[in-house]
């Protein structure tokens, strides 16, 4: 089955992604059987990527065992190795099913990655997934540098995660499959409004687009990209100040010269990283208090859980 279309032939981002891929390695594909992962399945075949398909059967539906069998048969027809992992009732638990399932799913993928010495794990996250994450983080008041959750290439410990579809909307993936008569699974949990993602997908995004009168997915993607660029920029700007900081166990000292204090956003970002490196999670309110003392060249002693933060003109000390 070939998926070549105007979308894929003209997609320079996909071309760049696969041009940089080490084709001598064998990869893993997380294959749910939904439109997203099935599209990626055929795309990897078309691009000549060697991979093993990994399917996790959560046992949530009476049809899940049959669906797993059909995916195994598909892989056999296409000459793709297939690995099935079926969760037991004990493994699934009875609370926070969505999060528990995700943890089990990734744990098995990471274990398979190491056992098979794979080159990476392909995941079929797409533009809508990314936009949902950006909006969720924005509404949760995440820092401006932390809005983008997923990258085309990222590492979790020693595991390489590959997401080549982040710039492509789900509708385009489904259209490509529908145009070729390729059937895919419809997961009812994607429509189950007990889950936040489903509520965002079914209610929040359509409502915002109706009220706003425009598609909001790609503006959110742009915001996520700029968030990642801002993070990279701040890392470079902050490096001289980090280099001057000292850490010993959970204590530390951060010099804050006037040139840093005069840049409020950068100064608070540097301080946040400084506290994080000492194992201290700080709120925006706390950072603002510390910054206010620095900007006024005033002294203060603040308690933060079991730590004492001492502020003097031009320096912050963790004791």
Curated annotation (Swiss-Prot):
The answer to whether keyword Electron transport applies is: no
- Cite the InterPro entries for this sequence: Rossmann-like_a/b/a_fold, TilS/TtcA_N, tRNA_Ile_lys_synt, tRNA_Ile_lys_synt_N
Question: Does this UniProt record's set of keywords contain Disulfide bond?
Answer: no
**Coiled coil: which residue ranges?**
none
Q: Which GO terms describe its biological process?
A: tRNA modification
Record-linked Pfam families = ATP_bind_3 (PF01171)
Example GO CC term: the record gives: cytoplasm
Domain of life per record: Bacteria
Enumerate the residues binding ATP: 32-37
Q: Where in the cell is it found?
A: Cytoplasm
Which catalysed reactions does the entry list for this protein?
cytidine(34) in tRNA(Ile2) + L-lysine + ATP = lysidine(34) in tRNA(Ile2) + AMP + diphosphate + H(+)
Give, as one word, the top-level EC class: ligase
The EC designation for this entry is 6.3.4.19
Could you list this entry's UniProt keywords, alphabetically sorted: ATP-binding, Cytoplasm, Ligase, Nucleotide-binding, tRNA processing
Domain comment in the entry: The N-terminal region contains the highly conserved SGGXDS motif, predicted to be a P-loop motif involved in ATP binding.
Alphabetized PANTHER family for the sequence: TRNA(ILE)-LYSIDINE SYNTHASE-RELATED (PTHR43033:SF1)
Q: Its biological function?
A: Ligates lysine onto the cytidine present at position 34 of the AUA codon-specific tRNA(Ile) that contains the anticodon CAU, in an ATP-dependent manner. Cytidine is converted to lysidine, thus changing the amino acid specificity of the tRNA from methionine to isoleucine.
Give the protein family: Belongs to the tRNA(Ile)-lysidine synthase family.
> What is the protein name stated in its UniProt record?
tRNA(Ile)-lysidine synthase
């Amino acid at each position: 089955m070939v998926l070549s279309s105007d979308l894929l032939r003209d997609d320079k981002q996909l071309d760049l992604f696969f041009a940089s891929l080490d084709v001598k390695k064998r990869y893993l594909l997380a294959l749910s059987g939904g439109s997203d992962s099935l599209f990626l399945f055929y795309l990897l075949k078309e691009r000549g990527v060697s991979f093993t398909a990994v399917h996790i059967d959560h046992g949530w539906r009476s049809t899940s065992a049959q669906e797993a069998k059909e995916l195994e048969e598909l892989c056999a027809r296409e000459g793709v190795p297939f690995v099935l992992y079926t969760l037991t009732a004990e493994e699934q638990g009875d609370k926070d099913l969505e999060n528990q399932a995700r943890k089990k799913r990734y744990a098995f993928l990471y274990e398979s990655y190491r056992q098979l010495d794979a080159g990476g794990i392909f995941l079929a996250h797409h533009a809508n997934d990314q936009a949902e994450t950006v909006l969720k983080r924005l509404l949760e008041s995440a820092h401006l540098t932390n809005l983008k959750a997923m990258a085309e290439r990222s590492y979790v410990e020693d595991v390489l995660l590959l997401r080549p579809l982040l710039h492509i909307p789900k509708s385009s993936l489904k259209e490509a499959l529908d145009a070729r008569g390729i059937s895919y699974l419809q997961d009812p949990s994607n429509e189950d409004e007990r889950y936040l993602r489903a509520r965002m997908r079914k209610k929040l995004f359509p409502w915002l687009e109706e009220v706003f009168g425009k598609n909001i997915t790609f503006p959110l993607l742009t915001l996520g990209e700029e968030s990642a660029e801002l993070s990279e920029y701040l890392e470079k700007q902050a490096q001289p100040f980090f280099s001057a900081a000292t850490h010993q166990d959970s204590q530390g000292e951060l010099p804050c010269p006037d040139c840093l204090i005069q840049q409020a956003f950068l100064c608070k970002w540097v301080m946040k990283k400084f506290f994080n490196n000492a194992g201290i999670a700080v709120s925006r309110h706390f950072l603002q208090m510390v910054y206010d003392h620095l900007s006024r060249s005033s002294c203060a002693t603040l308690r933060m859980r079991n730590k004492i933060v001492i502020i003097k003109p031009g320096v912050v000390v963790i004791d």
